[in-house]
């Protein structure tokens, strides 16, 4: 495991390649990604006396699951809500995970080009994430900055599992669902080496057609 010591914004981090990720999946016979969406109000009370309760909880989860999973997903909202302490806990966590597991920043970013560029730098350069979830609804210039970092991945929202997916993603227009248009269009912006999609696990009916 990597030392959880914080590193400087100019640090160069090794990225997990597609080949390495596939190798992990085959060796462990697992697609498991463990979520570290850590809510400090729900962690065991005995950890609240730790100097950094969130990191202490995450460390215990990582130690218990590292041999079973191929990666970890950190929902950044739970860390951002805690201010500086939350960011420190997130950075310590992602460094502790190390380079042998795929690290996803579940941040759902997406803004005008120069803003997305700063988001990409924050998660790919300042912190050593391998991938970040991205909202594509502002168009290509909001997604491209995440695709321009070699060895990094944009995981673009396609069809989500929340009830609100009915408001836009499942609208039927022009002979297809809106999410289908999103998948078709975004697929032209990247390759299988830097682009993935979020498809909600509750959408099993649509999953088979999407995978085709």
Region locations from a protein language model:
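A C-terminal functional module that forms or caps the active site or interfaces directly
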Residues: 201-212
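A general structural detector for well-ordered alpha-helical segments in enzyme core domains, enriched
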Residues: 57, 61, 89-93, 119, ...
